[in-house]
From Swiss-Prot:
Protein name: ATP phosphoribosyltransferase
Molecular functions per Gene Ontology: ATP binding; ATP phosphoribosyltransferase activity
GO cellular component: cytoplasm
Subcellular location(s) of the protein: Cytoplasm
HAMAP family found in the cross-reference section: HisG_Short
Residue ranges that the Swiss-Prot or TrEMBL entry lists as coiled coil: none
EC number: 2.4.2.17
Stretches that traverse the bilayer: none
Domain notes: Lacks the C-terminal regulatory region which is replaced by HisZ.
Function: Catalyzes the condensation of ATP and 5-phosphoribose 1-diphosphate to form N'-(5'-phosphoribosyl)-ATP (PR-ATP). Has a crucial role in the pathway because the rate of histidine biosynthesis seems to be controlled primarily by regulation of HisG enzymatic activity.
GO annotation terms (biological process): L-histidine biosynthetic process
Main location: cytoplasm
């Protein structure tokens, strides 16, 4: 039995399609109601949870494989896993965004940056050797500059529609985001053949 944790929502839908294309019977997933754990043929048990919980399950050896966004991996300080595959779904970017005049403004204090991702934000500005104030927001991060709480934001940008609707633009692209397949290192040691088989089937589905 291989236990898999998958992020609920958009990633769940996109990975389900990819697994079907790889030849896995995902009927139980498509027909499930409020179940949080389902078993499918090929001896796979799939657990559905929030993105951070997927990493927690993997960290504690509850699951062998996790499907989770690169944004969650970069924000989390747990790194004792193997990243075996970029699924190339859920693609978007991390970006610094603000009003168009951001780069021309003179700041006589630390810049205030709003984000749901303080670790990524801190690392990004540390590479630029900039000391900033990070303001953590959980909701619509775009509100930071709009209400005057922050000078700019670091957030995921998919279409850019929300930014433009609020007068904001991408100042700089930080990194590319997509869904990744990660594996518990102990699981990989003892279940390597089965895990590699899953990777190869997914890779074949991506190229066909």
């Amino acid at each position: 039995m291989i236990r898999v944790a998958m992020t609920k929502g958009r990633i769940q839908k996109q990975v389900t399609i990819l697994l079907e294309q790889a030849g896995f019977d995902m009927t139980a997933v498509r027909e499930m109601g409020r179940e949080l754990v389902v078993t499918i043929p090929d001896d796979l048990e799939i657990i559905f949870g929030k993105a951070n919980d997927v990493i927690t399950f993997l960290e504690h050896g509850i699951v062998d494989i996790g499907f989770v966004g690169k944004d969650t991996l970069d924000e989390n300080d747990f790194d004792d896993y193997y990243e075996l595959l970029d699924l190339k779904v859920g693609q978007c970017i991390f970006a610094l965004a603000s009003y168009p005049d951001f780069l021309n403004k003179k700041f006589h204090r630390r810049k205030r940056i709003a984000s749901k991702y303080p670790r990524i934000t801190k690392n990004y500005f540390a590479q630029k050797q900039e000391d900033i104030e990070i303001i953590k927001l959980e909701g619509s991060v775009e509100l930071g500059p709009v209400v005057g709480l922050a000078d700019a934001i670091v957030d995921i940008v998919e279409t850019g529609n929300t930014l433009s609707a609020n007068g904001l633009v991408v100042i700089e692209k930080i990194s590319q985001i997509s869904t990744r397949m990660i594996v518990n290192k102990v699981s990989f040691k003892f279940k390597k053949d089965k895990i590699i088989e899953i990777v190869e089937r997914l890779e074949n589905a991506q190229t066909n």
